[in-house]
């Protein structure tokens, strides 16, 4: 059997293992998923009338404005579970057992990554369905724009997942992993997810504009709602590629060096 065949076989085995864990212990996934859903309902039904003034529209306009940011926040929330899962594997010694077996070493991490991306996609679909149920519509987007939006969400999920894997590997326990990964769900709060960047204090606008989430959010808005994308599309892709590379090499270096 070739090296590629072994890698695919072992990665598939690790993927099944992680999906079985997620199905057997759904509480963590549900808790992480409920956060974006609750924020969506909170900002629409409690703060919607007040927040919509910031974009010059009504509540229905604010739903459309809010959803792209909440979809990305859903991905960030889901990947926190990945950091916890990786840290748990490291601290409980299962990784040490895998090291003694004749398996493709990177398959352990690849299984976590693919499983997390699949969970992120399912979570995004669920949050999207909730958004549609409360009034979100994207009637002008073409099939190509929908495909591009989906591709960006998958690429963003891949990038954040590799970062979360690295955070899990450097954390001594699951609690620390959860805390270390919190920026993945807090960064959207400092982006254009809830209010436009030009409505923020002048000194803070560059921080909000050029962090990873804002370009991706504005690109999703452009694809789904027809707003201007400008340079945000290239920035979003560049951030995704950079974070994926950073997370991959960080995780690989830590995984290969860690004696646990």
Question: Model regions: which residues?
Answer:
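Alpha-helical transmembrane segments and their short interhelical loops
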Residues: 105-181, 228-252
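Short alpha-helical transmembrane interface motifs in multi-pass membrane proteins
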Residues: 27-28, 65, 73-80, 111-115, ...
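Membrane-interfacial helix-loop-helix junctions in multi-pass membrane proteins
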Residues: 21, 54, 139-140, 191-246
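Short, membrane-interfacial amphipathic segments enriched in basic
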Residues: 1-15, 160, 203-214
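Transmembrane helix-loop junction
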Residues: 44-49, 88, 97, 101, ...
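Transmembrane helix segments
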Residues: 45-49, 168-210, 214
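Membrane-interface helix starts
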Residues: 16-35, 232-234, 259-260
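Hydrophobic alpha-helical transmembrane segments of multi-pass membrane transport proteins
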Residues: 38-43, 62-134, 164, 182, ...
